[in-house]
Amino acid sequence: MTKYSTELKIEIVSKYLNHEDSIKGLAKQYNIHWTLIRRWVDKAKCQGLAALSVKHTKTTYSSDFKLNVVRYYLTHSIGVSKVAAKFNISDSQVYNWAKKFNEEGYAGLLPKQKGRPRKVPKKSKKTTKKLELSEKQKYEEKILKQEAELERLRVENLVLKKVAARYPRYPTNKKHN
């Protein structure tokens, strides 16, 4: 619920634009601060009376939009309220974005993760690391080399067994006294 309805805003701004009363006179008549009426008038001049309508949904702005608003504010020598009226956003929003941009740069305009962090981290599924083709080929080549070495050692072992069987005078398993 907003403090001032759309109809009231349009009525006050229309009276000012039709030169029926001054901003200070309207402020006294409706018991509203004159700077607020000035913002409504600026917004209506830039974007029409439709810009005074009350928004009931929370708008999330992209970081590019924020950057455009801040750049416009910094390059043009006009106030926060005029920039806010031009882009149909609140004055405080322009001020906060400009402040964050000056302190943190573009990173300050990026969306932040909101809410309380989880106490227990999410259990992640085990992911198998996919090997690149070059790594896979290296492992296959290594396996082939090891298999060839194993076959060579088997043949050598077989030859040694046959030599030991043919020439028994060279004992292989007997202990020396």
Curated annotation (Swiss-Prot):
Annotated region described as Disordered, given as residue ranges: 112-131
Superkingdom field: Bacteria
Alphabetically ordered keywords of this record: Transposable element
Annotated Basic residues bias: 113-128
GO-annotated biological processes: DNA transposition
SUPFAM superfamilies: Homeodomain-like, TrpR-like
Family annotation (InterPro entries): Homeodomain-like_sf, InsJ-like_HTH, IS150/IS1296_orfA-like, Transposase_8, Trp_repressor/repl_initiator, WH-like_DNA-bd_sf
The keyword Transport belongs to this UniProt entry's keyword annotation: no
MF-aspect GO terms: sequence-specific DNA binding; transposase activity
UniProt-listed PANTHER family: INSERTION ELEMENT IS150 PROTEIN INSJ
Family in the record: Belongs to the IS150/IS1296 orfA family.
Protein's name in the database: Insertion element IS1223 uncharacterized 20.7 kDa protein
